[in-house]
Swiss-Prot record:
Coiled coil: none annotated. It comes from Pectobacterium carotovorum subsp. carotovorum (strain PC1). Belongs to the UPF0227 family. This is UPF0227 protein PC1_2487. SUPFAM superfamilies: alpha/beta-Hydrolases. The lineage of its organism: Bacteria, Pseudomonadati, Pseudomonadota, Gammaproteobacteria, Enterobacterales. Gene3D superfamilies: alpha/beta hydrolase. InterPro entries: AB_hydrolase_fold (IPR029058), UPF0227 (IPR022987), UPF0227/Esterase_YqiA (IPR008886). It holds the Pfam family UPF0227. PANTHER family: ESTERASE YQIA-RELATED, UPF0227 PROTEIN YCFP.
Length: 180
């Protein structure tokens, strides 16, 4: 089972395309939709939904995958639910770049600081990060500096922020998923 979390643009056709691509790894790909506007509510909703999916799945090696803002959530929710994560161009600082788009961007700071202390150290090697060298929305070098000490960084030289095609990376994602 692969759980997919969309980014801020939840209606983008790219989400459906990525779900179809992920089905080459595992036929059971489940998209969880969330508001993107209310961080605290989103956190509770995502934790509840992911936990329910894990409990009702017979896959002993589930994976959570998130793109952009979904990457912010996938890293944290995956850690808290003890499943591996793949985060694609994760929005690590939504409080800085989501102002005017969401109601309370400051809640992201609260969530980030209230997650388990040193959670990335405790999550070491359980998350794979895919970054685009041509991300027009986020500073991928900043993300690499923040995450590189804990997780494998996979660089892509073609994709932009929305990372329309993950196909070239499917074998790597599949291998990462099988590690459980």
């Amino acid at each position: 089972m692969i759980i997919y979390l969309h980014g801020f643009d939840s209606t983008s056709p790219g989400n459906h395309e990525k779900v179809l691509q992920l089905q080459f790894i595992d036929e059971d790909v489940r998209l969880i939709s969330y508001s993107t506007l209310h961080p605290r509510h989103d956190m509770q909703h995502l934790l509840k939904q992911v936990d329910k999916m894990i409990q009702h799945s017979d896959d002993d090696r589930p994976l959570i995958c998130g793109v952009g803002l979904g990457g912010f959530w996938a890293e944290r929710v995956g850690f808290l639910c003890d499943i591996r994560q793949v985060i694609v161009n994760p929005n690590l600082f939504p409080q800085e770049n989501m102002g005017g788009k969401i109601d309370r961007p400051e809640e992201y700071v609260d969530i980030a600081t209230k997650c388990v202390a040193n959670f990335r150290e405790k999550n070491r090697d359980r998350c794979m990060v895919m970054l685009s060298r041509h991300d027009e929305m986020l500073d991928s070098q900043r993300s690499a500096q923040m995450l590189g000490a804990y997780y494998e960084i996979v660089w892509d030289d073609i994709q932009t922020h929305k990372f329309k095609s993950i196909s070239p990376h499917l074998q790597r994602i599949k291998a990462f998923k099988t590690l459980g």
